[in-house]
Structure formats: C-alpha cells, structure tokens
Regions:
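Basic, low-complexity terminal or inter-domain segments flanking catalytic cores
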Residues: 2, 25, 80-82, 87, ...
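OB-fold/S1-family RNA-binding modules
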Residues: 49, 100-105, 232-247, 251, ...
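Intrinsically disordered, low-complexity regulatory segments
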Residues: 1-168, 172-174, 465
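C-terminal helical "lid" subdomain and adjoining coupling/linker elements of P-loop NTPases
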Residues: 185-192, 203-247, 290, 429-431
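Conserved PLP-enzyme active-site core in the AAT-like
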Residues: 197
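Conserved short loop/turn motifs at secondary-structure junctions
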Residues: 1-3, 108-110, 187-190, 267-276, ...
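Metal- or metallocofactor-binding catalytic centers and their adjacent structured scaffolds
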Residues: 242-278, 284
C-alpha cells in the first residue's frame, strides 16, 4: 500500500478521487492500492519552555533556546492553553495509515511551509518508510495524474525544508525570548511579540498617531484658462504659494493680461505593456482597491478557487510563468475566449511570442496565478469578483500593448510659467478588458484631447482663479496599503502576511473601521510599551528572507543563519533588560 499525506481534507479527497481511492474511512480514503490521509493545517509546533519543565524564567536563563522536540498544536480553552483534541485524534489516524503502508508520498503544499509540515510529521511519528514528493501547481485531474507519474525524491527538497525549519526556529527564538523578556520587565503578560507581528502593529499605530497629531497647512494655487477653437484649457502655475498675498498678486497680474504665449508643446507616444499576471500580494491589493475585500478574504477565497480547480496555486510570490506553463495557455485561452463576454477579444490575443517579463525560468515555489480554463460553475459574489480579476489579468497578459499619447503644454502668462499635462488613448489593447485608465495616467493627469498649439502662439486668456489647497492627514492603512508595506519592508512572505494580520485581529490589537485598519486601545498600549525598541523595528529581520533564500539555494547553512539570529535575540533581550533595570532602579 502507498500512503499519501496532504495538508487539507478537500485536497486529500480530490487526489483520492483521481487515484480511485474511493472508499471513505474515518480521517482517510482508501482503495486501488492507496491510503490518502490529511492534516488540518500544521498540527505540530516547537515546544515552549514550560513543555520542557521550565516553570519560571529568570534573567540568567536568557537567551532561551527551543527544545529539541515538537509538540501537538495547542488551542485556548476555559482551562488555558491545551493540546488540540482534533489534532491529537487526526495524528493517531495518520500514524495508523502510515504504519500500514510501505511507501509515503508527501502531497502537502509545494512550498517551504508544506515541506516543513510533512518533514515534521514524518519525524514526529518516527516513520522509516521511503518517501516521495508530489509537486503540483493545480488540482486539475491532469495536473494530479501528471504529478503522480513524475514523483520526485524527497531529498531533492532538503534545502527547502532547511529554509522553512530555519525560519520556524528563528521566529521561535525572537518571538519567545522577546515575549518572555517584556513580560518579566514590565509585567506585560498574556501577550506575544512576534518578529513580524510587532513591527507591523507598530507601523499601524505609528500612522494612526501621525493622523491624530496632524496639523493642517494651507497653500494657494493660481490657474489661468485659455480659449482656443471654443475649447477651454485650464493651466496651473508651476509653484504653489504658502502665503495668500503672493497668489493674489499673481492673480491680479493675470487678470490684466489679454493673451498668454505658448512656450513649449511636448507630445510623446508610448506603448504600455499589460501588467504581469498576479501573485497573491498584487491580487490582494487589487481586490481591496476595486472590491473592498480584505487580505484575509482574498487568501481564503483563492484557496477555495484552487480547491475547485479553477486557478493555479494561489500563495505564490512569483509573477512569472515558465515556458512549459506558457505552452499550455493557448488551450486554456481557447476555453476562456469561447465565453460570450470575452469572445470579442479572440482576434486580439497573440501567443506566438511570449513577452520577456512573462516567460522566464527560475520562479519561486510556484508560477504566477492563472486560471485553469475549467468552467467556474456557480460562485458566490466574492468568489466571482476574485475569479474575474485573475481571469482578466490572465487574458490581459496576452493582448497587444496599449498606445497612449502624453501631452505637456507650457504657457507664459504675466511673465510666469503655467502648465497642463493630459493623455489620450490611441489604441486600447489590453486596456479593453477592465478599462482602468488610472494605470496609464501619469500623476493623476486627466484624459483630454487638446487643440493643436504651436510654440510662440498667443492664446486669449478667458479667466483665472485662486484655489486654496489644504493638506490632509494621512489615512489609516487599508489592506491594499498594509500588504504593500509588508512586501516592501520584507516583513513575512506572501503566504504568511495574511496570517500576521489575522493574528493581530484575533488578539484584538487591531480592528477594521470601514475599509481601514486601526489599532485598538490594547494595541496602542502595546505600541507605547515597545515603541523605539529593536523588536518593533522593521530593519531587525528585514534581511531574513534573503538569507533564507540562500539556505534554499544551498549557499548558507542553518547553523550560520541561526547564529546570526541568536546575536539579534541577545540585543533585543539586552535592551529589554535595561528597561527592567531602569524600572527597578529609578
């Protein structure tokens, strides 16, 4: 018998169906020589100090090191944190399945986290059987069948596991040590300081405080209106005035002028290529911008669409497609373009020469998110919105460039320079799909066709006006901005950022106010406690991902990486210890 382990029941059942393992048992499927079982996510974790008998932590015990054993996932109950009974029961079922089989196939997520989940499970249950890896990027019948026909040796992914395990141990080192230390220093118990969670909360709070403390300032803009061919063109003075009297002086000068002179006319055309296909971060940003869906909603929805075989693996950081994946897309596009709403674009798509920024080797765990071409069937409103974004972006990538003409006109009026910038679309190309012209507008310039002007030409001034401009406070973070900030700052990965937001919500550090993410009183109190500390600084661990990538490539060892992390932990706990000393020795 061959055992197959997945990390979700739905995925396990789908693989079992394709393989003919159609007999349902408690916690697994069996048949046709296979036993397919599953975990409920990651059911194992590194042990905590209390699990190894450490009842009380003293300053001399720092830095704390992770015990060498794993424990079953704990959940909060009325009696405190206890082992998850559902995880315990499923682990017994998995052990039964694995003990009954000669070979084990790891069918967990084809990613760092999925690899670590299987390796930890394999070690925890003390398995000895040979193991193979199923590595697929979609759950279509074809992908599963092809993957099973080309199983890979597990040792090929040793470096991937080392990277995941290193990240897991580093998170434990920094999170547990800083949490225990801050609790001991300032009595801030029942709270955790995660290496990503804390700087993200600090940034949300910093921006919230900046908004609270904001003082508005006024400036004044002067506009002149020119008239040609019965068309009014409004131009703005190139500088804003901080004092009204200077704006008023220029306004008076312009009112006294009958004609302005065209100083320069610049027209340029540009072919703008379609955006690359989505990764999860870009999809979360667009779904929040256009449909007000949260990052958590988008991750959950895409996982559901993946399990329904409608899209490829969603938790990817890549926006690239390898050549072999690209070669499958004409057949996928044929299915899409047969749909009524997309039939008009059939003649516009071109698969003959893949764009260089689309077809590439060396993607991360998975290629960009694309549709599989399977009929979507019945989807709820939110699923349909996300699916349409992915579908449209997949189609956009293989349509012609959009041609845009940008025009800048400079005018001299009352010896001062005024300017206007506009654009117009000459050929829509990929812009035909969603029509989102803000993607091509430079600096928010308007779309407008201007009359023909020539340098030196006098043009009648039809009016002028002054506009007061008041600075506005920065808005709290939206999910679009927050995941973008985390991405730019190197905080977390595409597959972990959503869980960081989820954790902050569950621990009541943050909440939603409409579309904005704002801190709670508890979150602000926590922020005031750690503000200025290294543990709240994004730079503390922003280089981790680059080092983890080097471990994955075999260029850095786990010992070297964790040695550097341990030095960071000593800095963090040392800083907290100094706070403790100052508190007790005022």
């Amino acid at each position: 018998m061959i055992a197959i382990v997945t990390d979700r029941p739905n995925v396990g059942r789908e693989i079992a169906r394709v393989l003919g393992a159609d007999r349902k048992e408690n916690g697994y499927m069996t048949g046709n020589g296979y036993m397919v079982t599953w975990t409920y996510g990651n059911m194992l974790s590194l042990a905590m100090p209390k699990d190894s008998g450490t009842a009380r932590v003293e300053w001399k015990d720092f830095p704390l090191l992770p015990p060498s054993f794993l424990t079953v996932r704990h959940v909060k109950t009325d009696t405190g944190w206890n082992p998850d009974i559902n995880a315990l029961l499923q682990l017994k079922i998995i052990a039964k399945v694995l003990n009954a089989c000669d070979t084990i196939i790891a069918a967990t997520d084809a990613s760092r986290e999925g690899e670590m989940l299987f390796r930890h499970l394999y070690g925890f249950l003390e398995c000895k059987q040979p193991s193979l890896r199923l590595w697929i990027s979609s759950l279509t019948d074809e992908a599963i069948t092809e993957g099973m026909a080309s199983l890979l040796p597990c040792d090929r992914f040793d470096n991937l596991f080392q990277a995941a395990d290193s990240r897991n141990r580093a998170d434990w080192l920094l999170g547990v040590n800083s949490s225990y230390a801050i609790c001991k220093a300032v009595g801030f118990g029942n709270n955790s300081l995660g290496r990503v969670q804390t700087p993200v909360l600090a940034e949300i709070c910093r921006r919230y405080r900046e908004r609270e403390n904001f003082l508005p300032a006024d400036s004044w803009q002067v506009f002149v209106s020119l008239c040609k061919d019965r068309q009014i063109i409004k131009l703005r003075h190139t500088e804003d005035f901080q004092e009204y009297r200077y704006a008023s002086e220029l306004y008076g000068d312009c009112k006294a002028v009958r004609n302005a002179r065209i100083a320069a006319v610049n027209r340029e055309s540009e072919d703008i290529r379609a955006p690359a296909p989505y990764n999860l971060t870009e999809l979360q940003k667009d779904a929040n911008r256009y449909h007000n869906l949260t990052a958590i909603q988008v991750q959950d929805i895409t996982q559901g669409l993946y399990e329904k075989k409608l899209i490829s693996y969603p938790r990817t950081a890549s926006r690239l497609l390898t050549r072999d994946v690209y070669d499958t897309l004409p057949a996928v596009m044929e299915k899409i373009l047969s749909r009524k709403e997309f039939r008009q674009y059939a003649k516009m798509t071109d698969f003959a020469a893949p764009p260089s920024d689309i077809s590439a080797q060396g993607t991360t765990d998975h290629h960009a998110i694309i549709v599989t071409g399977m009929p979507p069937g019945t989807l709820n409103k939110e699923e349909q919105l996300v699916y349409t974004l992915i579908l449209g972006r997949t189609l956009e990538a293989f349509m012609p460039s959009c041609r845009v003409e940008y025009t800048t006109i400079d005018v001299v009026c009352a010896a001062r320079k005024f300017s206007v910038q506009t654009y117009r679309v000459l050929k829509k190309g990929w812009l035909s799909i969603f029509g989102r012209e803000h993607l091509i507008a430079r600096g928010g310039m308007p779309c407008s066709a201007l009359p023909d002007f020539s340098p030196g030409e006098p043009v009648p001034v039809s009016g002028c006006n002054i506009v007061r401009k008041r600075t506005l406070p920065v808005s709290p973070y939206t999910d679009e901005e927050l995941v973008g900030y985390m991405d730019r700052s190197g905080l977390g990965t595409v597959s972990t950022r959503t869980n960081i937001i989820r954790t902050l919500l569950e621990r009541k550090y943050i909440r939603y106010s409409g579309k904005y993410v704002i801190p709670t009183p508890k979150g602000l109190f926590f922020y005031e406690t750690v503000c200025g500390m290294k543990v709240a600084d994004t730079s503390l661990t922003s280089g981790w991902e680059a080092e983890l990538a080097r471990i994955e490539q075999g260029k850095l060892t786990q010992e070297e990486f964790l040695g550097g992390v341990l030095e960071q932990v000593k800095e963090v706990t040392g800083e907290i210890f100094r706070i403790y000393q100052a508190k007790n020795n005022p």
